[in-house]
């Protein structure tokens, strides 16, 4: 019997620690359940990813959320949402604010 997933990302170029190549990604209950040729599997939804690269979550090691003091440029909400939309799952905040957020007292 074929496996069943909630979602299959089909035909993309998967990039991971082994390199890159055409593979499918099966997702079940919000988690990666299979990375393989899933042509015999079924899913509630299948997304054709041909011509797209599938990447693990990206870490952005230099962001400036500008909060406090410079939120007219960017704030935590807009910066975080932008990061998520770009596939970023973790950020390193660089304090470029007024006042500088470099101490526990300033962050309180």
Locations of regions flagged by a protein language model:
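Metal-associated gating/positioning segment near the N- to mid-region
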Residues: 52-108
